[in-house]
């Protein structure tokens, strides 16, 4: 077999690219064929030329080419920080649950899936049971989780459930088959659970089309901390799960078709909840028997009239009930209607600590059932109406002997007694003469007092001095005002004298001169009269005309009286700069205090100047 001619890289790439364009899916097969048909070096030994074929597989070429392209593109792309998933763990688990194919989701992919519908899973088979499609029931259904169910847990009933109200079905047996446990032979309908929480959706209506099954409702009191029990596969209880407190046969159950013609009891509303057919909690008995049946008060009177009444109770949605007022307090015929009742077995019926509902109004022993009925007494009307009377209970008139009225006692006058006093204060009835005279005297004294008060109500107050004479306040006020004025004038005069008359006059003259100068323009010229007069009157030393000026002044002031003034040598300075009298002979007769003061001021000023010069010496 002849050796295949060697291929150049360009031809090899051309063949490879044409093969890639023809079909990508056949790339692996062609690669294998090429590897099988790889040209072998011809001959053994050193004959001819040894060709080393740089055969690279198409996968390696494609990856290297893509890596090169990615490296080239990465230079143009912006740098992005690494994405860090900071979502909570619940959201991640929910996303993993939805994205995985292990679970079969029912309905829409919303987060409310666990609370939409619940199915019973009694076997390991995870396929859902048959769903009821008889009525558009979007409310949550309870499911049995006897096996480890990986589905999300159902929502509790003590949380607000926004599901709408169900309409009751009035057909005798037209509903689709119920969901029945596969390991149970119980034919009784599911019991209605009680929800004391603000759940707007009422519980499902039990269907009473089964023979010999009375409508039992299981109470779910919210104060009861015990969780609902789950029945097991091997449970001997073949009835649907109910919450009971005794294992003995329940003697309080009664079929509707029995000869007993008693009405179904109506439980009173503990709260103004108008949701139809919502049962309320009842007080438990001490003997451990728990009430198993309680009908809603909002439904009408349920009567037993034969087998035709075996259907479930009517829904108040379809029956007119005009009475939506708050619950009325029923009145008992006996004085002990509100006291605690003792049945024939001596069981004192009280509300236990776990049952926090308000106690019901107990009826008298005459209205209670037989000893076999261990359910708590219900509120009943005092007069049993006929079977045709379906009207709501009327408001009963209050009897005088009823102790059930919890309102406080009224303040009323005892019968046969009238008010002892009238509005004016006088006594009623026959009054003795002494009492009448005393009342008259008191009335006269009151009238005199009132007249005296009216007379001196606006009178002026009379003030007297120590001797008892009346004081004229107006004159006293005038005298005080005059005296104050005189004192103020004298104080001003003494203040003026204390400051000095000459100083005050000079100060006043200076103020006048300053006001006059303020009226003149800012620039004064040579032709200013005041300025020329002031310069002429000045005496200058060495002036040859000084004597002539003095003579002229003396002639001008000859007719004017001028006080003589000291004209000798300069006197020593004083604090007030006062000149001595014209008769002073020039001898200093002081103790030298003024001289010392001026010397002290001069030395202080010299020291300050020397200190300043020393501080700025180096500058």
Swiss-Prot record:
Cross-link Glycyl lysine isopeptide (Lys-Gly) (interchain with G-Cter in SUMO2): where in chain: 65
Residues bearing PTM Phosphoserine: 28, 127, 139, 151, 163, 172, 175, 197, 201, 214, 222, 226, 235-236, 240, 248, 258-259, 271, 281, 325, 354, 357-358, 391, 407, 567
Phosphotyrosine modification, residue list: 494
Keywords in alphabetical order: Coiled coil, Isopeptide bond, mRNA processing, mRNA splicing, Nucleus, Phosphoprotein, Spliceosome, Ubl conjugation
Residue ranges, compositional bias (Polar residues): 246-264
Low complexity bias: start-end ranges: 404-415
Highest taxon of source: Eukaryota
Compartments in which it is found: Nucleus
Coiled coil: 433-520
Modified-residue entries (Phosphothreonine), positions: 123, 135, 147, 159
GO biological-process terms attached to the record: mRNA splicing, via spliceosome; U2-type prespliceosome assembly
Comp. bias (Basic and acidic residues): 109-128, 139-160, 289-306, 335-353
GO molecular function, one term: RNA binding
Disordered: annotated segments: 20-56, 106-429, 538-578
Recorded GO CC terms: nucleoplasm; nucleus; RES complex; spliceosomal complex; U2 snRNP; U2-type precatalytic spliceosome; U2-type spliceosomal complex
Quaternary data: Part of the activated spliceosome B/catalytic step 1 spliceosome, one of the forms of the spliceosome which has a well-formed active site but still cannot catalyze the branching reaction and is composed of at least 52 proteins, the U2, U5 and U6 snRNAs and the pre-mRNA. Component of the minor spliceosome, which splices U12-type introns.
Reported function: Involved in pre-mRNA splicing as component of the activated spliceosome. As a component of the minor spliceosome, involved in the splicing of U12-type introns in pre-mRNAs.
Family per similarity comment: Belongs to the CWC26 family.
PANTHER family (alphabetical): BUD13 HOMOLOG
Protein name in UniProt: BUD13 homolog
């Amino acid at each position: 077999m002849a050796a295949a001619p060697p291929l150049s890289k360009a031809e090899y790439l051309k063949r490879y690219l044409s093969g890639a364009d023809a079909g990508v899916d056949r790339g692996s097969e062609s690669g294998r064929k090429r590897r099988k048909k790889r040209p072998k070096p011809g001959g053994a030994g050193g004959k001819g030329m040894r060709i080393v074929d740089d055969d690279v597989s198409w996968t390696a070429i494609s990856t290297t080419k893509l890596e090169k392209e990615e490296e080239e593109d990465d230079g143009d792309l912006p740098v992005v920080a690494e994405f860090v998933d900071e979502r909570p763990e619940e959201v991640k688990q929910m996303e993993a649950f939805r994205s995985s194919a292990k679970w079969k989701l029912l309905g829409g992919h919303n987060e409310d899936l666990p609370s939409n519908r619940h199915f019973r899973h009694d076997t390991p088979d995870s396929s859902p049971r048959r769903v009821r499609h008889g009525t558009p029931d979007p409310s949550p259904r309870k499911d049995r989780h006897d096996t480890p169910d990986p589905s999300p847990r159902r929502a509790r009933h003590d949380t607000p459930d926004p599901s709408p109200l169900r309409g009751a079905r009035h057909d005798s047996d037209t509903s689709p088959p119920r969901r029945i446990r596969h390991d149970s032979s119980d034919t009784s309908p599911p019991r209605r659970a009680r929800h004391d929480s603000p759940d707007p959706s009422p519980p499902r209506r039990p269907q009473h089309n089964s023979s010999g099954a009375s409508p039992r409702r299981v109470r779910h009191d919210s104060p009861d901390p015990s969780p609902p029990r789950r029945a097991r596969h091997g449970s001997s209880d073949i009835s649907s799960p109910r919450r009971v407190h005794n294992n003995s046969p329940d003697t309080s159950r009664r079929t509707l078709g029995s000869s007993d013609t008693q009405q179904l009891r109506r439980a009173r509303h503990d709260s103004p909840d108008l949701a139809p057919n919502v049962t309320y909690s009842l007080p438990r008995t001490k003997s451990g028997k728990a009430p198993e049946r309680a009908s809603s008060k909002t439904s009408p009177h349920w009567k037993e009239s034969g087998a035709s009444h075996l259907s479930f109770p009517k829904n108040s949605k379809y029956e007119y009930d005009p009475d939506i007022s708050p619950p009325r307090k029923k009145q008992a015929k006996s004085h002990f209607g509100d006291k605690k009742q003792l049945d024939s077995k001596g069981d004192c019926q009280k509300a236990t600590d776990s049952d926090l509902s308000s106690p019901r109004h107990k009826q008298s022993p005459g209205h209670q059932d037989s000893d076999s009925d261990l359910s708590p007494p219900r509120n009943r009307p005092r007069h049993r109406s006929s079977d045709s009377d379906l009207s709501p209970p009327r408001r009963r008139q209050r009897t005088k002997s009823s102790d059930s009225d919890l309102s406080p006692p009224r303040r009323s006058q005892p019968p046969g007694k009238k008010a002892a006093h009238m509005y004016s204060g006088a006594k009623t009835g026959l009054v003795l003469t002494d009492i009448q005279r005393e009342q008259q005297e008191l009335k006269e004294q009151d009238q005199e007092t009132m007249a005296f008060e009216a007379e001196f109500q606006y009178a002026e107050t009379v003030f007297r001095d120590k001797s008892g004479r009346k004081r004229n306040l107006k004159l006293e006020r005038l005298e005080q005002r005059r005296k104050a004025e005189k004192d103020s004038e004298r104080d001003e005069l003494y203040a003026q004298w204390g400051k000095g008359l000459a100083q005050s006059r000079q100060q006043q003259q200076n103020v006048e001169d300053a006001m006059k100068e303020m009226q003149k323009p800012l620039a004064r010229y040579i032709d200013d009269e005041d300025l020329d007069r002031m310069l002429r009157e000045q005496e200058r030393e060495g002036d040859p005309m000084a004597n002539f000026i003095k003579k002229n002044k003396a002639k001008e002031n000859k007719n004017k009286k001028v006080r003589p003034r000291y004209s000798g040598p300069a006197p020593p300075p004083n604090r007030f700069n006062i000149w001595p009298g014209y008769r002073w002979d020039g001898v200093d007769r002081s103790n030298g205090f003024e001289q010392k003061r001026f010397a002290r001021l001069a030395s202080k000023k010299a020291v300050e100047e020397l200190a300043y010069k020393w501080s700025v010496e180096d500058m």
